[in-house]
Amino acid sequence: MKPSLSVVLPAKNEQGNIRPLIEEIFSALNQHTTFEIVLTDDGSDDQTGQEAIDTAKRLGCQLKVLRHPYSCGQSTAVHTAIRHADGEYIATLDADGQNDPADVVAMLEKAKQVRNPHVCVAGYRNKRKDTPWVRTQSKIANRVRQFFLDDGVPDSGCGLKVFRRETFLLLPYFDHMHRFLPALIRRMNGEIVIHPVNHRDRGAGVSKYNVWNRLWVGIVDLFGVMWLRRRTRWPVVEVTHNDQ
């Protein structure tokens, strides 16, 4: 039987974080829904993938591990995982342990309550556990993005999101697309729901982001998304008759 939910983890060199994260995912979801974990090992040179396999076997947790031979970036890792996922719904989490899997339960319920099939429940880290410099970078990036896209999302950098797999597969794929999921889903007449989430200190390892790939690279993609939104329009369709 296919799971209702696929928990997607893009991971690069997250040995030491994966074991406790999978344990938390299992604890949070095991009594609430059928689920699988789909991890993309994005060119790690540590034991990230094996740590995930060992932990899932011990727990009896359904797991898929996919591997890129070299690092392709977070968006590609997410895209790879979702293409191989079996769940109707997708929950994306950062693999560093800063997202709290306990938030997924409420976010999934919110997604199921929305009648619009193209829904995205986006996490909002209102009490971030990052350095002041990182928080400043994110605030600038969010304000710039909000000014140009007006997507109604206060925290586009939050990796914790829930949406339908079929919705994601309708989106155009490009590098760094994970930053713009709400804007892309809204473009197809989707509905965005903001959900406050817990944010925690990183357990091990170091962040893969800096001022270059957090802000300036994102600005280039921002103008690409603006162009895409203006060039394409999804019509609102009302079914007036269906014999099926």
Regions from the PLM with identified roles:
Residues 1-132, 139, 166, 170, ...:
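Structured catalytic core of nucleotide-sugar glycosyltransferases
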Residues 114, 136-140, 215-219:
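Hydrophobic/aromatic residues within well-ordered alpha-helical segments
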Residues 132-135, 207:
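Short aromatic-enriched loop/helix-cap "lid" or pocket-rim segments at secondary-structure transitions
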Residues 158, 169-176:
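Conserved nucleotide-sugar donor-binding catalytic segment
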Residues 125-132, 145-161, 178, 187:
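A recurrent flexible, glycine/aromatic-enriched loop bordering the glycosyltransferase active site
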Residues 60, 137-139, 143, 148-149, ...:
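Long helical/loop segments within the catalytic core of UDP-sugar-dependent glycosyltransferases
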Residues 1-4, 143, 150, 174-244:
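Hydrophobic helical membrane-anchoring modules
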